[in-house]
């Protein structure tokens, strides 16, 4: 059996891998799977809204309702509201308590089941909860030491990623503002007409058709698209006789144009 020191080293190695993008589906899935393996339990990481950031279920509860929670990537609101009120690690919650993650209809199947909840903090804010559960066998002090280590590092990672995303959003907003401000009135009118022709964030347009539709020259559209592409707000590709393929890279463009009437 691995010693506490060996397990600590394993968890440290796992956490050093880090996470680079919170926007991807289940960004902490791989990490949670490896943590669950070291601690020997089922586990999941949720944010303060109850959305799953990662989970691992080596021990199946064989319950359709619980399986659906993980399929939907979200725990029940009632459970989440109770979980976010846990401010310090709560270990070995019995199976018949509200914070136990075991389904009520299956309590008799897991009489010795226990749940442990550990809050995740970063930069002084509550960012989520690390939840672990076992069908049999309480979490020991050694297990809880590993849990505290894991939640501390996850909290630092989450706060750093949130800061990076905030900075990236500010950068994109600034770039979108600057790009729109370089457009003349006619060019802005053209861009808004083009955006309305797209299917969401991408699509193909025919400049001459749009030019005739809003009463401007084709060159105005070409100049407007060139400015936006130079600013990294859109990308375009000629489709020959079919027109031009456009993709909006910076969705802040939509907000900058939304309040303008022509």
Swiss-Prot record:
Residues 207-226 bind DNA. Pfam families: CodY (PF06018), HTH_CodY (PF08222). Transmembrane segments: none annotated. It comes from the Bacteria. GO terms for biological process: negative regulation of DNA-templated transcription. NCBIfam families: codY_Gpos, PRK04158.1. This is Global transcriptional regulator CodY.
